[in-house]
Amino acid sequence: MGNDQIAAAWLDEGACRFAEYLYQKTYCTDLDFDGYGTLEDWFQTQYCMITGQKKDGQQYAEDKTDLDWSLYDWQKDDPMGYSEIYYKGGSLFYEMEQRMGEEKFRQALREYVRTFAYGTVDTEQFRQFWLGKGDFSKLFALYWK
């Protein structure tokens, strides 16, 4: 399964960062990035940035990462900000897992891979697939505002 890496870079970068989280959660439970926390911590912080909530008593800067931007948009307007799609995309997968539960999410993730295997998926197909698995409309509205 692939995607348009220029037009929807967040899809593969976010999925890869989420896959790193799954690996870390399974095999590296004591890893904390030299005091910077786990990927789960980073995903939770990203969600707080998106929603304006505090985490551990701290207020974080508002998230302005636009998942609809292409690589050309990032290059033109904010080359250094591109790296944020890794965490925002990964955080979206993480939040969907939290809402569905680990087992249901993994079953749906397997179906997602089977559905789009040997083809490509775009942001709208991603949204439609996952809206068929749960009520993510409010979550998606947060991530694409």
What are these regions (language model features)?
Residues 43, 60-61, 96, 136:
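Extended hydrophobic/Leu-rich segments
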Residues 58-79:
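The feature captures the short pre-catalytic strand/loop hairpin that immediately precedes
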Residues 26, 57-60, 103, 116:
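A short secondary-structure junction motif
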Residues 4, 8-9, 13, 65-69, ...:
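Flexible, active-site-adjacent loop/turn segments at secondary-structure boundaries
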Residues 31-33, 73-75, 81-145:
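Amphipathic alpha-helical substructures
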Residues 1-49:
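Zinc-dependent metallopeptidase catalytic helix centered on the HExxH motif
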Residues 44-55, 113-123:
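Short, mixed-charge aromatic SLiMs
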